[in-house]
Amino acid sequence: MNPHFNSFKNIITNPIKFKFFLLTKLPAAFFAGLSIKEFSTDKSVIRVKHSWWTQNPFRSMYFAVEAMAAEMASGMLVFGQVYKRNPSISMLVVKMEVDFVKKAIGIILFTCEEGQKIQTQINQSIEDGEAKTFICTSTGKNELGETVAVFNITWSVKAKK
């Protein structure tokens, strides 16, 4: 585990620091109203609410907002493992596949539970200096617990020399 993970967690679980983090690093997520509901080394849950700001012409959540929340659910786990790491580690989304199952209306929670996989891949990149690619799944569920979308996000990480 990244020795600086808890420092990162303290930033993003503090509501004021998290809003500043979004405004400076991910302004679109700030304006879409994304928030963190749960965060640990293993799991990240991102909350997004269907509203006038996040809707499409069909009165459901715009797909790009769903993609942003899904990517953030896995991305926060990746970012927590690369935060202040020495050597520094680059992180990049290289592919995204999605199944939209149901109209996204109301509050949607995107969950990624791939923290252990992420830690393993980053540690291997540090050990051998090679880029690693891996898929993280982020599942969006509505307030009734029904799946609205399943995103498979392919990340690439590489320890810099």
What do these predicted ranges mean?
Residues 1-31, 53:
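Alpha-helical membrane-targeting segments
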Residues 30-36, 94-100, 121-123:
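Short structured motifs
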Residues 77-116:
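Hydrophobic beta-strand-centered segment that forms part of the acyl-chain substrate-binding groove
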